[in-house]
Amino acid sequence: MMMMSNLPNDLVEEILSRVTVTFMRTVRSICKKWNALTKDRSFTNKYIRNIAALGEREFLMIKEFSIYLVGVNLHGIQNNNFDLSIELKGKLISMDNTIRRFCISQIFHCNGLFLCVSQKDMDNRLVVWNPYCSKPRWIKPSYNYRTVDRFALGYDKSCGSHKILRLFGDNLNNLEIYDLSSNSWRVPNVTLERDIVYMQPGVSLKEKTYWYARDKESEN
């Protein structure tokens, strides 16, 4: 019987590209060769193509301050007939114990990175987490974080850097941006609309963040 270690590299890549993301950390821990292979860009692209070919979309769900991966198969949506297959794939965990103790209330996604926000008021911590590599990055605030603050995670193509947007203050009229490349906050020279009320935390969809908001005049 041929052992896995004796198989051709292209065959090993094909096999590993069909492993679900919840078991990828286990795969990487088996041997250095597999760890290096699964972090290669060509493997990542193939992995994404395989998932797309299944007609399945994956969503993140927060339950009891932890993150779970949920798979939704969309093949059943044809001719206005809805037959969705929903599967709880597993809990996303980190080897870093500080992440495990972090009470997550909001999460935003961009290019494989997660921005996690604590549910505790005045908890001066944000974390940017790459679950694929299990590497958390703690972000220090310029001012104390509050549960009413609004956040977003994005990518600036002009400089090749991920950035965090934060709205804060009594009326969320203050804006600052954190650059992950320079590890620093800055206040952009922009004026925010003062007549907008942000009703709920943002929702991350297809690398963009959306907020449910309305005019102050419509509150009555």
UniProtKB/Swiss-Prot annotation:
Coiled coil: none
UniProt cross-references to Pfam families, sorted A to Z: F-box (PF00646)
SMART domains according to UniProt: FBOX
Residue ranges annotated for the F-box domain, each copy included: 1-51
InterPro entries assigned: F-box-assoc_interact_dom, F-box-like_dom_sf, F-box_dom, SCF_F-box_component
PROSITE patterns recorded: FBOX (PS50181)
Name of the protein in question: Putative F-box protein At3g20705
Organism: Arabidopsis thaliana (Mouse-ear cress)
